[in-house]
Each structure stands twice: as C-alpha cells, then as structure tokens.
Amino acid sequence: MDPCKVNELRAFVKMCKQDPSVLHTEEMRFLREWVESMGGKVPPATQKAKSEENTKEEKPDSKKVEEDLKADEPSTEESDLEIDKEGVIEPDTDAPQEMGDENVEITEEMMDQANDKKVAAIEVLNDGELQKAIDLFTDAIKLNPRLAILYAKRASVFVKLQKPNAAIQDCDRAIEINPDSAQPYKWRGKAHRLLGHWEEAAHDLAFACKLDYDEDASAMLKEVQPRAQKIAEHWRKYERKHEEREIKERIERVKKAQEEQERAQREEEARRQSGAHYGPFPGGFPGGMPGNFPGGMPGMGGDMPGMAGMPGLNEILSDPEALAAMQDPEVMVAFQDVAQNPANMSKYQSNPKVMNLISKLSAKFGGQA
C-alpha cells in the first residue's frame, strides 16, 4: 500500500476519533455498514451533528456569517502553535516492502534458514551495510513470516535509512503478531518522531519503556514528550473554546425556540379571541340589524338583538355549510359590517360565501320577526 495513502488513512481515523459525527454523513454510509458488518460499533454522532441534522437550513444573514467566521477563527495563542521541527524529514514514498506470506506452512528447516539469515543480517548491519541488512532480513521474513522480531529488526534498519513509513509498516505487522514485544513500539515511536508525529511518538516510546525499559527509548521520549504535551494542551484549549461556543449557540437556539413558542401562543390566543368575537352570532350583531337587508332578505325586518333564542337556530347550526361560514372570519367581518350599516350589503353581492349564508338565513328566518 502507498505509504502516503496509509498516512492519509491514519489522519482520517484520528479525525473520526475526535469527531465521530464524520462517520454519520451520507458519504460515509458505506464505511458504517462495513464496520457494522464486521461486528464493530460506530460511535454515536455528537449532539451538534444531531442538532444540525434536525434543523432546517435558513438563509444566512451576511453580517451574522461574518461574525460567525470571526468567532470560528481560533485566537492567535491557539492558532500559532509553534513546534520545533528539528530532525523532522519528508515521508518516504517507496513501494511497500515484501511482508511474506503469513499463510505459508513453515517447516523447521525454514525456521533454521530464517535464523541464519537474521544472524547474517545483524553482522552486515554492524558493518554499516544497511541495504544488505534489509535484503537479508527480507529473506528471513519470507522464510518465517510469523516471527515478530524479524519485522522489528528490519524496521530498525529502515529508521536508520530514514524511511519511517516503511518502518511503521513493519512495526504494525510485528505488533499484530506479538503485541507484548517492546521493540516494535520503540522503533515505531522513533519513526513517528522522524515524521513529526509527536503524540504518536510519545505514546509508542512510553509504552515500549513500560513493557521493557530501554535507555535509548527513554532518552527519545524525553525529547518528544514536551512537544506532545504542547500539542495536547493546544487541542484542549481549542476544544474548550469550541465547547463554550457550542454551549452559547445551544442557549441561543433554546432562547429562539422559546420566543417562537411564545409568539405562536400569542397568535393562537389572538385567533381564539378573534373566533370568539366573530363566532356564530354570540349575543347578536352589534346594534342589531335594523330594517331589511337591501338587495333582498324578504321579511327579515326589525332588529336582531341576539340569536340564542331564535327558533330554528339549532337547525342552522346543524347545517355544516352554514356552520363553516359562521366560523369563517371573512364572512363574519362582512356580517358585522352589514349589521352596522345595512347599505353595505351591496359590497358583498359578488361574494358567494357571504351571499350563500345570507340565503340560508333568509330562507330560515325570512318569515319571523
């Protein structure tokens, strides 16, 4: 595998650990399904991701966008993280080294031959012949690909050749075979140090010393640890500031939701009051309905002080169309207008909803005084 791709994958995994919501995007569905199919469990999305998923997008205000961008900019103290990069090199991009066939059936003869190759590799290594040592360790690995120390030894040579990615690949394989061996952690820590991966280097070197104390590993740990701690502190400050901003945003969202709820309640209350005011003739039209409606409500003379006691009212209220019209604010406004000034009837001659109700009332009460 291309070492650059491996580094990109490592960075992606680190990002997922810091923010699991990355895995809950639609683009990452295939990865979630694969992890779950292998028996793994995808961490739940962060609260922020859930809230963003459940919130409809609104057209942003340009001023607010500018303020948000400024708020998202880390302070100079946090953004200007200066780390001494002395000794850091560019990553190696050679083709992956031969790793052997882990499924091969190993005989005693092959194990003996692998051991001979290892001894020969150590001898040429002591003579400074690094590439020849790599070749001999590779031969030993192909003969016995399930011996962790062979990968660790070859990794040590890759570190000396300043090929940290190749060394990391060997150490990863050695740790898979024997996770209790200190050597792979030591050399992987040194490889990470060459790449400027201070946190990873500190972790591996510390773990190597924990498994089997080594002065060389301890000395390098003392070198990288302050840088790793500085980075960790930087991220703590950033995350703390990020969390504070999230809390403020959450408070603002709650406040806005409360205001929206209160506004909706006020509007609902206003609608109820409006409905009560223009409801089905409570207490009659103000001032009654003097005289006859112009334009034809025959026999509907006199005032209408109230409809509660009017004969036939229950029948009218049981008529769905009439009841719906009485609950229509537009119709009831028209009735109030006509009640105050019957001459205004002419304004509603072309309104079928108003005239339909008038026709029903005229038919029902036309002959009653």
From Swiss-Prot:
Belongs to the FAM10 family. Residues 319-358 form the STI1 domain. It comes from Homo sapiens. GO terms for molecular function: protein dimerization activity. The modification N6-acetyllysine is found at residues 353, 360. Pfam families: HipN, STI1-HOP_DP. Its main location: cytoplasm. This is Putative protein FAM10A5. CDD domains: Hip_N. The keyword Transferase does not apply. The lineage of its organism: Eukaryota, Metazoa, Chordata, Craniata, Vertebrata. GO terms for cellular component: cytoplasm. TPR repeats lie at residues 114-147, 149-181, 183-215. It is found in: Cytoplasm. Residues 89-98 have a biased composition (Acidic residues). SMART domains: STI1, TPR. PANTHER family: HSC70-INTERACTING PROTEIN, HSC70-INTERACTING PROTEIN-RELATED.
